[in-house]
Curated annotation (Swiss-Prot):
Known role: Catalyzes the ATP-dependent conversion of 7-carboxy-7-deazaguanine (CDG) to 7-cyano-7-deazaguanine (preQ(0)).
Matching Gene3D superfamilies: HUPs (3.40.50.620)
Cofactor notes: Binds 1 zinc ion per subunit.
UniProt-annotated binding residues for Zn(2+): C188, C197, C200, C203
Disulfide links within the chain: none
Cited InterPro entries: QueC, Rossmann-like_a/b/a_fold
Cofactor(s), by name: Zn(2+)
The protein, known as: 7-cyano-7-deazaguanine synthase
Catalytic activity as recorded in UniProt: 7-carboxy-7-deazaguanine + NH4(+) + ATP = 7-cyano-7-deazaguanine + ADP + phosphate + H2O + H(+)
Gene that produces this protein: queC
Family that this chain belongs to: Belongs to the QueC family.
UniProt entry tagged with the keyword Metal-binding: yes
Native source species: Bacteroides thetaiotaomicron (strain ATCC 29148 / DSM 2079 / JCM 5827 / CCUG 10774 / NCTC 10582 / VPI-5482 / E50)
Length: 219
C-alpha cells in the first residue's frame, strides 16, 4: 500500500474542502471521491469537481443513490421540512442514516484497488450536530472493521475531529484557502453556494464560526 497517497471523501463543502487542502499539505498525491446519494442539491458535486480541478487532484464520483431511499431525511426527501434545531432526544432529520458508514466503506474499497491506505474525512465531534456517525468512537471502530474486513492497514484521518468551526476557518486560512472555501464551497442545506442562505443549521454554524475566527484574528 502507498503510504504517500491519500483519498479524501469529498463533498465540496467547507469541511471536506479544508481536509482536501490539508491532505495536499501532508501527502505527495491526493485523490478526491464524491458521492451522488440522492441529495436534493447535486450542484455540490459539480462544485466539488471544480475545486478538485483547481487543487490539481484526481477526482471521481460514485453513484450510490440507493442510500437516499433507505430512510427518511430532509437532505434527500423533497417533501420533508428541515429541522432548524436538534430535536430533544433524537437526531435532526438532516441526518442521513448510514451515510458516513457507506461513504468510508466504499472509499476504502476504492482506495484498496489503487494501493492507497490513507483515507481522509471531514467529520467533527465538536460540531457534529448530533450525528452519531461523526463521532470519534465510530471512526475508530470503522477503521478497525475495514482493516479486518479487507486485511489491510487503512488509516482514517480526521483533521477536524476535535476543532470547532472557528478553528476550521483558522486552518483554512493557514492553508491559504480561506477565500476559496468561503466563496466556492457549498455547505448550505438549501443549496446556495458560498455564504449560503444564512439561516439553515449548516449556514448558521458556518457563519458563527467565521465571525468568531475573524474577530479573534483582528484583535
Amino acid at each position: 500500500m502507498n503510504r504517500e497517497t491519500a483519498l479524501v471523501v469529498f463533498s465540496g463543502g467547507q469541511d471536506s474542502t479544508t481536509c482536501l487542502f490539508w491532505a495536499k499539505r501532508n501527502f505527495k498525491k491526493v485523490y478526491a471521491l464524491s458521492f451522488l446519494y440522492g441529495q436534493k442539491h447535486q450542484k455540490e458535486v459539480e462544485l466539488a469537481r471544480e475545486i478538485a480541478r483547481k487543487a490539481e487532484v484526481e477526482f471521481d464520483v460514485m453513484d450510490v443513490s440507493f442510500i437516499g431511499t433507505l430512510g427518511h431525511n430532509s437532505l434527500t426527501d423533497t417533501t420533508m421540512v428541515m429541522d432548524q434545531e436538534k430535536p430533544a432526544g433524537s437526531v435532526p432529520n438532516t441526518f442521513v442514516p448510514g451515510r458516513n458508514l457507506f461513504f468510508l466503506s466504499i472509499a476504502a474499497v476504492y482506495a484498496r484497488e489503487r494501493g492507497i491506505n490513507h483515507l481522509v474525512t471531514g467529520v467533527s465531534q465538536t460540531d457534529f450536530s448530533g450525528y452519531p456517525d461523526c463521532r470519534d468512537a465510530f471512526i475508530k471502530s470503522l477503521n478497525v472493521t475495514l482493516n479486518l474486513a479487507m486485511d489491510e492497514q487503512f488509516v482514517i484521518h480526521t483533521p477536524l475531529m476535535w476543532i470547532d468551526k472557528a478553528e476550521t476557518w483558522a486552518l483554512a486560512d493557514e492553508l491559504g484557502v480561506l477565500d476559496l472555501i468561503r466563496n466556492e464551497t457549498l455547505t448550505c442545506y438549501n443549496g446556495i453556494q458560498g455564504d449560503g442562505c444564512g439561516h439553515c443549521p449548516a449556514c448558521t454554524l458556518r457563519r458563527e464560526g467565521l465571525e468568531k475566527y475573524l474577530k479573534k484574528k483582528n484583535q
